Amino acid sequence: MKIAVLGGTGDQGLGLALRLALAGEEVIIGSRDAEKAVSAAQKVLEIAERDDLKVKGATNAEAAEEAEVAILTVPLQAQMATLGSVKEAIKGKVLIDATVPIDSCLGGSAVRYIDLWDGSAAERAARFLEDQGTRVAAAFNNISASALLDITGPVDCDCLIASDHRDALDLASELAEKIDGVRAIDCGGLENARVIEKITPLLINLNIKNRIRNAGIRITNLPE
């Protein structure tokens, strides 16, 4: 499967690209700057210490056009501009949105959640794309970039997924479970992205409080 990681030069995108490439998928890292994307693809090969992985860099629009599914891994402030640049390219495809509405608190390193009129970043993306058949899922919001980039062990975190489209839920779940240690959790409709996205600032602040980098979440006692 060809997977575009849009805005994939940051830690979250790089980590997802790395893990999915290691799982045997064909990954295209996208960026506004194609040269940065090419450099990020090279970094994936260096971290993996392999030169046989199927990973390359391109502009966001080129990556989205070529891929079968796109994962959006940009800061909130870049979400809508990035979606605008790839809107035609992802027409009729599945978009997995990992955007989290957070901002740094003044005077400290802690982060806080930003309330959005649409309810969540994923719902905002879905409304922007709703007239062209793009199915949106919220996923990968709560998974630590540090854990993704540390390939010496599995990722100790569930992936909470929400979407109004069954095929998007299933595809996001399939990709999540290609990452060693990750279990996909079907959280229902996209409205639940409002809760999923709010967990991330809590995890980040727990990291800061406990001087760690990879706090995660597990949902217990679910049926197999």
UniProtKB/Swiss-Prot annotation:
SUPFAM superfamilies: NAD(P)-binding Rossmann-fold domains. Its EC number is 1.5.1.40. One of its GO terms (cellular component) is plasma membrane. This is F420-dependent NADP reductase. PANTHER family: DUDULIN-RELATED (PTHR14239), F420-DEPENDENT NADP REDUCTASE (PTHR14239:SF0). Optimum pH is 3.5 for F420 reduction with NADPH, and 8.0 for NADP(+) reduction with F420H(2). It comes from Methanothermobacter marburgensis (strain ATCC BAA-927 / DSM 2133 / JCM 14651 / NBRC 100331 / OCM 82 / Marburg). It is an enzyme of class 1 (oxidoreductase).
